Amino acid sequence: MKIGAVGFGNRIAHVYFELKEINKDAQMIAFVDPLPIGKKFAIEKNIFPSKQYNSLEEMLGKEELDLLMIGSPNHMHLEHIQKGLEANVKIFAEKPIVANEEQTWKLAELIKKHGKENILVGLVLRYSKHARSLRKLISEDKLGEIISLEASEHIMPWHGGFFMRNWRRKTSYSGGFMLEKCCHDLDFYSMVVGSRPIRVGSFGGRRSFVPENIPELSKGDNLDVYKEYNILGWESKEEVFESDADIVDHQVAIVEYENGATLSFHTNMKVPDEFRRFAIIGSKGMAEGDFVRGFLTAHDSHTGKKIFDENFGSAFQQGTKGHYGADRMMLKDINDNLINNSKQTLPVGVLDCMEAGLVAMKIDESRLTNQIINLKNMWDKLDSYNL
């Protein structure tokens, strides 16, 4: 399996490493990236590709690839996907698939022309043990009709400090924090509910990583705790509390789905004891879990009895790496899909990724306009492409 990459950052380096662990014949033969931040990790793992090209066109023109991995900054994804589709190459694109609504409609046009079979997406939570167990509970009707959900994704201060310094701090590059970081979660809960969001509302802003909150430092102390993740790269800066970022550092959203279910969602990027928790309440039972702490339980509504109890391991437990172990599970399924020529069904596709992205964008529109946003016209437009 011959692989090329456009954007060889730390994420794509780790994705390739996981694929290589599963399939020793997978070989990344070339990449395009003027500043390959994933190089250090790749060299340590002895997987750094030997050929570097100046452009994607040049690489696609000179190499016969079985897979193109797209790990470039979000606003570049559309251009790189288009070139991959036109070259008839199978694509793995990191989330979010594109960076704004205009790009979403352009991608829809591309998919209408070229088909969606050649695009695989990195919405990794769908591959997690939590997702697999929840799908089983739902298919067995243990939870009944999903009534309401509450969920959160919080990250540690050092991770928030990374967002304040990395290119992701600029909405023009990333599409915003809700899109960049939380489209995973929005997709996951749409999967659980089995319905599209129809109305969204949101509040949020930047109140933690601001100059007035710079910690008072004792002698010998410094702000390095906020720079623990120091793999920065393109367009990065050093400032954390005085960052020129235009993204939020906290946000809440409310979502109503077409089938009547509701979700309240909360994200904050300065949480020292981070968690990624959810409670799913149905007509017959409830499930609650935490990706970070690793647990998933379910209870019967009528009897109160626990009907499911599993601990998949803490995210900080030794050996539990890569999105709570889901990276390895994702790459195993994708490898099977590639080897079996798309006969292996995957739990998520490019249309799911587009929908999650659109919801994130509308959540931010609500935050910026101080209005509840109805999504019906948006879904009508997407459906008109018959994807």
Residue map of PLM features:
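N-terminal Rossmann-like dinucleotide-binding module
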Residues: M1-I47
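Predominantly a Rossmann-like dinucleotide-binding segment in NAD(P)-dependent oxidoreductases
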Residues: I12, E117, L125-F241, N370
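Short, Asp-centered acidic motifs that coordinate Mg2+ and/or phosphate
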Residues: A30, L67, S148
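Active-site loop of classical SDR/Rossmann-like NAD(P)-dependent oxidoreductases
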Residues: P34-I37, Q318-K332, V348-E355
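Conserved SAM-binding strand-loop segment of SAM-dependent methyltransferases
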Residues: S50-S55
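Beta-strand-loop-alpha-helix segment that lines the small-molecule cofactor/substrate pocket
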Residues: K62, D66-L67, P73-N74, L78-R126, ...
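C-terminal helix-rich "cap/oligomerization" subdomain common to oxidoreductases
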Residues: L67-M69, E258, R293, T303, ...
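NAD(P)-dinucleotide binding in Rossmann-like oxidoreductases
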Residues: G204-G205, P211-L217, D224-M329
